[in-house]
Amino acid sequence: MRKSKAETAETRRRIVEVAAEAFRANGIHATGLADVMAAAGLSHGGFYRHFESKDQLVAEACEAGTVSILESLENAAGASVGAEGLRAVVDAYLSSAHRDAPGAGCPLAGMGSELARGDEGTRAAASRSVEALVTLLASRTGDPQEKANRSQAVFALSAMIGALTVARILNDPEASDALLSDVRQQIEAIAPIEPIEPI
C-alpha cells in the first residue's frame, strides 16, 4: 500500500530528526545510514526513497539542528536585548546542559570539523547555519546588518563553538566548567554597556 504524501513527508522528517541527533552526538562518519534508519524504525533499504545520498541527509540534518538551537537560544534570551540579550544567549550556549547534550546541541560544535570536509551542499548548509547564528547574536546587540555588530557576533560565535568543543573534550568536569565560565566572561566583556531599546 502506497503512503500518502503527508505520511512520506512525516517519514522524511523523522529520518532527518533522528540523523540530526545521531550526527551531533556520535559524528557523521561514525553514524551509518543503517543506524539512522533503524533508530527511525525503518528498513535500511528505504533510505534512497527519501534522499539521494548521505551528504543530502547531512545537509538537512545540519539545517534541522540549526533550527533547534536557534529556537533554544531565542527562548533563553526572550525579549532581552543589548548586553542582557547577548549575555542570555551566551549563557545558554556555554552552559553545562548544552555541553552535556551534544545530540540536542549546536550542529556547528557537534559536527564542525566534518562539515568543513563535506561536499558543496553540506558546506552550504553549514554556512547558512553560521549566518543564522551570527545574525541572532548581532540582533541582540543592535542592527544585525551593522558591521561592528556583525564583527562582534562573528567573534563571539567562533569563541562559543571553540569553547563548547574543548569543554566536551576535557575529561575533568571542573576544568570543563571553568573553561565555559571563563569564555562566557570574556565574550560578555565585549557586549555593549547600555542596553538598546527594542525595535
Segments (PLM) and residue ranges:
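N-terminal intrinsically disordered/low-complexity leader segments
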Residues: 1-10, 194-199
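Solvent-exposed, amphipathic alpha-helical segments
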Residues: 14, 18-25, 72-75, 159-166
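Helix-turn-helix
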Residues: 14, 18-56, 60
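Amphipathic alpha-helical segments that line or abut small-molecule/effector binding pockets
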Residues: 17, 83-98, 154, 177, ...
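Hydrophobic alpha-helical connector segments
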Residues: 60, 74-105
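Short, basic, alpha-helical segments at the C-terminal edge of helix-turn-helix-like DNA-binding modules
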Residues: 63-68
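Amphipathic alpha-helical segments used for helix-helix packing
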Residues: 85-89, 99-127
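Hydrophobic/aromatic-rich alpha-helical bundle segments in the mid-to-C-terminal region
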Residues: 119-128, 140-199
